[in-house]
Amino acid sequence: MDKVMAQLESLVAHYEELQEMMADPEVINDTKRYMEISKEEADLREVVQKYKKYKENKKEIEDNKEIISNETDSDLIEMAKEENAELEKEIPELEDQIKILMLPKDPNDDKDIIMEIRGAAGGDEASLFAGDLLRMYEKYAERQNWNVSMIDSEPTEVGGYKRVAIMITGDKVYSKLKYENGAHRVQRIPVTESQGRVHTSTATVAVMPEYEQVDIDIDPKDIRVDVYRSSGAGGQHINKTSSAVRMTHLPTGIVVAMQDQRSQQQNREKAMQILKSRVYDYYESQNQAQYDAKRKNAVGTGDRSERIRTYNYPQNRVTDHRIGLTLNKLDRVMNGELDEIIDALILYNQTKQLEELADNA
């Protein structure tokens, strides 16, 4: 904790500098700079407040010890002892909170995301489940005051999706939804099942951070561009011109289709932006996979082949296999109430990081 305390002192000094800069007329008149400083100040605020509270508690404890040692009034001594009992109970809690706030931040946590959901094993039932997951994430996004926009979709005749890609924008989207990467398994009785048997199907979810300006050069020769007509559910044509765009990055096989914009040019620009994000993420993930392989206490790669969660409809139960969490409220989870699961995953990840820091200390 001593190392952390030394870091915190310089952090507080930097925080106070930022506050002074925010009051500087020159900074106030420079909107971009002001926003950057304001964001940094907001990011540091919680840890600075916790540290100040920690220092206040420590000082009050020492002051009370003075009273206990030197005071003759028994009532004052008893009051100081009671106060110290409460303050000392808060100290380890504050230390844990500070340690978590001081953990290295994922540089992508503030980013918006591109989410792709695919029906996997299970045919029509898998495509229906992909649609259910889409609605679950849309409802969760609504609860978080995030915005969801459709990028591309392949609807099925039964009302599900073979594949659907969406963009979710808002505050710290990636920090919460990055844990959704992987295979999601559903156990339920399909509508078409006459014998009442429970079937098992899967859908995969891929979550990628959306990079505003990706520093990656893609050779135009490595991209194949196809244009086609935009279509709605069931294959109905939205327009009669070839405005939809499909881009394939040949070296990686990454495909991006875009039909949500009004013109082919807009679809091309958006598709290229997303393609760059995905190619960048692909190479970043390779580096991350090599790093994770060396980590003794890896939380999990988030690989799509992993079965991360099971949704059991007959028993109204959802289980996250990575952390052994089971909730008997599947109906509420499918209605977008994901906070309990996501908060538990964040806490698990933070605990693992703290263990690693302790091992390396």
From Swiss-Prot:
Pfam families: PCRF, RF-1. PANTHER family: LD18447P (PTHR43804:SF7). The lineage of its organism: Bacteria, Bacillati, Bacillota, Bacilli, Lactobacillales. GO terms for molecular function: translation release factor activity, codon specific. The keyword DNA repair does not apply. Gene3D superfamilies: 3.30.160.20, 3.30.70.1660, 6.10.140.1950. It comes from the Bacteria. InterPro entries: PCRF, Pep_chain_release_fac_I, Pep_chain_release_fac_I_sf, Prokaryotic/Mito_RF, RF-1. The keyword Nuclease does not apply. This is Peptide chain release factor 1. SMART domains: PCRF. Keywords: Cytoplasm, Methylation, Protein biosynthesis. Methylated by PrmC. Methylation increases the termination efficiency of RF1. NCBIfam families: prfA, PRK00591.1. It is found in: Cytoplasm. The modification N5-methylglutamine is found at residue 236. Belongs to the prokaryotic/mitochondrial release factor family. Peptide chain release factor 1 directs the termination of translation in response to the peptide chain termination codons UAG and UAA. GO terms for cellular component: cytoplasm.
